[in-house]
Regions:
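Select transmembrane alpha-helical segments in multipass membrane proteins
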Residues: 15-26, 92-105, 141-145, 205-218, ...
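Loop-to-transmembrane helix boundary motifs in multi-pass membrane proteins
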Residues: 14, 18-19, 139-143, 239-240, ...
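Hydrophobic transmembrane alpha-helices that form the core helical bundles
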Residues: 43-44, 54, 63-146, 150-154, ...
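Membrane-interface "cap" regions at the ends of multi-pass membrane proteins
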Residues: 1-40, 44-45, 49-52, 62-71, ...
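Membrane-interface loop-to-helix entry segments
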Residues: 137-191, 247-251, 377-382, 408-412, ...
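TM-loop-TM module centered on a large, flexible mid-protein loop between adjacent transmembrane helices
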Residues: 84-88, 92, 124-128, 203, ...
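C-terminal membrane-solvent junction of multi-pass transporters and transport-like membrane proteins
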Residues: 337-338, 384-469
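Helix-loop-helix junctions that connect adjacent transmembrane segments
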Residues: 7-15, 52, 129-137, 169-299
Length: 482
């Protein structure tokens, strides 16, 4: 009789994801449901000119970050799970654990954003059933979809890449149609007249303008989480060159779509009008010009967008504990695969965490969607910082090939490091406390994985103590004990 322990077998010839599949993965990971409310989100606090300025700053910063992942995929093609493996290679196993765990938890929260957005969108079709996306009907629907994504992800990265390619095309088409339809109503004179918002050039002060830019950047920065998508599954890619090209192509396409979606409405609506639009604002804008069918088009796009991104993140998150376990910073149980190379225990753990967070969202006070978005953003930034600094360190004094100039790697590494530091500096202090607390909750996972070996070096022990103290002091301060 054949053995049933197929999880322990590593497939000899796993199927690989090609350039098109990787590009779709990057686009789908970044182009989530947030794009459908982008016009209203940025217009609530920024004029057209401020939004353009925010996109310039964000675009340059994220271009540097995209090049960090592009160059690292070329210089270190043997590191098959980018975000984690770069941290572990550059700064030791404990830092590797922090990035692996932080990135994993961060995007578990991001998946809960999808779990809230989807039923709240469907409430337009079934009024009163799903509400704001956190009632028990919503939880039941989102839970069912979460486990369906688990089943699909267990079929392997290549199988899900095909589904994701179809989903990516399905989500991009409504966005392109929105840009074309709103572009047909665009008035250059109207745009110029209202470019600085309701205050106008006469009364707008410089400090107010940069406050508007900062407000818009809080939205634009969150939208780019997922830029590392091709790197995270680089172990499943046909080659390192495909990973590099997919990262840059996906970034460019997504940036162009984001800029056009956020700017084109200013050609026929004022800032105040766009900021007052109902969620999702893309649907409300089209409905204002073209009637109900415009809103229907966008809502269908949201459903496709969320389902596609949900699947992508399930696959990506399944890779993180798997590769971390191979380097003994996660428990060895996560090393197991099924016969098609899918890391089933890792996928199962991800699904269970997401399931728990979906239920938790029901009890969150206030806007649960915004809470999940904020936690996702603050947990992602340290991960990007570590990868950026690793490239800077590597280009400064590490081994280097002739494929990319060392000075190029040094410049992009330094620029992305400074950009990531700025993002962390701008984060809300309460969110940083939450991040430290989440890291501390994960420490037992690392202790379990390293129980038979040296757990910490001296510097790692100091870092762990600092994180614990920061979490304790922050919590005590928030509850008024100090």
């Amino acid at each position: 009789m054949a053995s049933n322990d197929s999880w322990a077998k590593t497939p000899a010839q796993p199927k690989r994801v090609g350039l098109f599949g990787l590009v779709c993965l990057v686009i789908s990971a970044m182009l989530g449901g947030g794009v459908y409310n982008l016009p209203q989100s940025v217009a609530q606090g920024a004029s057209a000119v401020a939004v353009l300025f925010a996109w310039i700053v964000t675009g340059l910063g994220m271009l540097c970050l995209a090049n960090v992942f592009r160059i690292l995929s070329i210089e270190k093609p043997e590191l098959k799970n980018g975000i984690y493996s770069y941290a572990e290679k550059g700064f030791g196993r404990f830092m590797g654990f922090l990035v692996a765990y932080g990135y994993w938890v961060c995007n578990c929260f991001a998946m809960v954003v999808y779990a809230i957005l989807l039923p709240s969108t469907l409430d337009l079709f079934f009024p009163g059933v799903f509400g704001d996306g956190t009632n028990w009907a919503s939880i039941a629907l989102s839970s069912g979809i979460t486990w369906l994504m688990f089943v699909l992800a267990c079929r392997g990265a290549q199988s899900t890449a095909i589904i994701n390619a179809i989903g990516t095309i399905g989500k991009v088409v409504p966005i392109v149609l929105f840009i074309l339809l709103m572009g047909s109503c665009f008035s250059g004179d109207f745009f110029a007249q209202h470019a600085l918002g309701s205050q106008g050039a006469a009364t707008l002060e410089r400090a107010q303008f940069f406050d508007q830019v900062g407000s818009a950047m809080m939205i634009t920065l969150f939208l780019f989480i997922g830029i590392e998508g091709a790197v995270v599954v680089s172990g499943e890619a046909v080659n390192a060159k495909a990973v590099s090209r997919a990262t840059m192509i996906g970034f460019t396409v997504t940036l162009v779509l984001y800029v056009l979606v956020s700017i084109v409405p200013y050609g026929s609506f004022t800032q105040d009008e766009i900021g007052a639009m109902a969620n999702p604002s893309m649907a409300a804008l089209l409905a204002s010009h073209f009637g109900l069918w415009g809103a229907l088009l966008v809502n269908v796009g949201i459903v496709i967008s969320v389902l596609s991104a949900w699947l992508v993140w399930t696959v990506m998150l399944g890779q993180m504990p798997f590769y971390a376990a191979k380097d003994r910073v996660f428990p060895q149980v996560f090393c197991k695969e099924n016969r098609v190379g899918a890391p089933v225990p890792s996928l199962l753990a991800t699904t269970l965490v997401v399931q728990g967070l979906i239920v938790l969202a029901h009890f969150v006070q206030g806007n649960a969607w915004q809470v999940m978005v904020n936690i996702t953003a603050v947990m992602a930034m340290p991960c990007y910082l570590v990868c950026s600094f690793y490239l800077f360190k590597l280009a400064l004094r590490g081994p280097w090939s002739s494929c990319v100039r060392r000075s190029t790697g040094l410049a992009f590494g330094l620029a992305a490091t400074l950009f990531s530091c700025y993002l962390i500096y701008e984060a809300n202090i309460e969110l940083l406390v939450v991040a430290c607390t989440i890291f501390v909750i994960g420490f037992p996972i690392y202790l379990w994985a390293r129980r038979k070996e040296q757990v910490f070096t001296k510097s790692e022990a100091c870092l762990a103590v600092i994180i614990v103290i920061a979490a304790i002091v922050g919590i005590c301060s928030m509850v008024g004990l100090i």
